[in-house]
Structure formats: C-alpha cells, structure tokens
Amino acid sequence: HIDHSGLIPLLYVNGFRGQVFATSATADLCTVMLKDSAHIQMFEAEWRNRKAKRADRTLKEFVPLYDIEAAINVMKQFVGCEYGSIIEIADGIKIRFIDAGHLLGSASIEVWLEENGVSKKLVFSGDIGNINKPIVKDPGYLTYADYVIMESTYGDRSHGGTPDYIKELVKVFKRTFDRGGNVVIPSFAVGRTQELLYFIRKIKENRLIDRDFDVYMDSPLAIEATNIFIKNIS
C-alpha cells in the first residue's frame, strides 16, 4: 500500500487539508505505515548529512519529504469507507470501493460524475489480486464503465495455477531442520508476512512436520500490521 499512499503526508506538508477517502482497512494500515515511512526518511536524511559532514562536503542539507508529525496529523483527515457503499464526496461526484483482492484494504474505485445533466462512470482498477488467496477475498467484478484507468504491471503475463506454497515450505523446513539449522525468511511487513504466518499455522495445525518448532516475527511494523489484519478479517 505504501507505493499508493506514501506521499499523502507530503500533500499535508504542502498545505492540503481536505478529506482522504480510503477503505477502513487501508486507513488502519496507514496509521502505522506512514509513520514508518517518515521514520525511515528522517533516519536516512540524518545519515546522509553526517556522511557529507565527515567528508567535509558543502552539500545542500538532506531533508525528508515529511516527518512523523505530518504522518500523524494527516491521519485526522482520513475517512474510512466500507466496500460496496456509495459515498457522495462532492456535488455531482460519487464513489464506491470494490474489493480488489490484492492486499487487505485494496480496492478498485467506481466514480460517478454528473455535470449539466450528463452522467459518466469512471473506474480506476488499482492493483488487482489473484483468486483463491489465503487471507483476502477474491476481486469483485465490475460490469460497466464509460472510462477505465487500469493498473497493468503484469497485464502481459499468463498466470498458471496457484502454487502449493504450504508444500514448498514443508520441504524447506524439513530439509533445514534435518541439518540442524534454522529457517530465516525475509518478507514484506504488510501482506506477505501475514500470508506466511497463515501457511505456517496450517503446517503446525495439520502436523505436516513431525516436530514442533517456534516461530519468531522480528519486525515491529509487521507485528502492528498483523494486529490490523486480525482486526479487519476476524
């Protein structure tokens, strides 16, 4: 989600004080992701400035796009919306969020525009997920639009069947445990980590490995995101 929402605090820094409409789950995730983004920027700017000072270079000071205060303040402008509800955001403009099945909170957006008695419907697809994913629902279907703005990063690919992720994980776990090792899995904090936790739980519940093992998630952001997943899918 951060590639879609990460610059919203910069709008706030530049004076934007309007409402930000998003699905409720996306709004929840933004409360932690935007602060994390600000923290990373502030840390990197500080590191670059220290490095430039040590090199005795008179470069322009590195400044983050926004700080944590801006990330917190802009959240007050968020309006959480539910899937399927038609919302009038201004005279002659209505929107509806449809589950895109990509990540928790992801959505395609239907926009109805009416002016001088003429009505048009515009659809922005957003990132569209695949079907039969373990946590999020399948993408919703749209039946009509006058104009479509479509995300198409993988539009030229032919997708086969869904891989058996649990089977592959079991192979890796068994091979590593048999050698006396530990399994370390780097993963995106939002989305992928939660899917991995789901797969690992299924492995343990169904006793697909003939030994018990502990699971540690070493990421404050992933822990906060997981709690938001639990809140929104339970």
Language model features with spans:
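Short, surface-exposed, charge-dense and proline/glycine-enriched linear segments
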Residues: 50-58, 214-223
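His/Asp/Glu-rich metal-coordinating catalytic cores
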Residues: 1-5, 11-195, 201-208
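Ligand-binding beta-strand-loop-alpha-helix segment within the catalytic cores
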Residues: 234
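Short, conserved secondary-structure transition motifs
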Residues: 29, 191-192, 215-231
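Short edge beta-strand segments in beta-sheet-rich domains
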Residues: 210-212
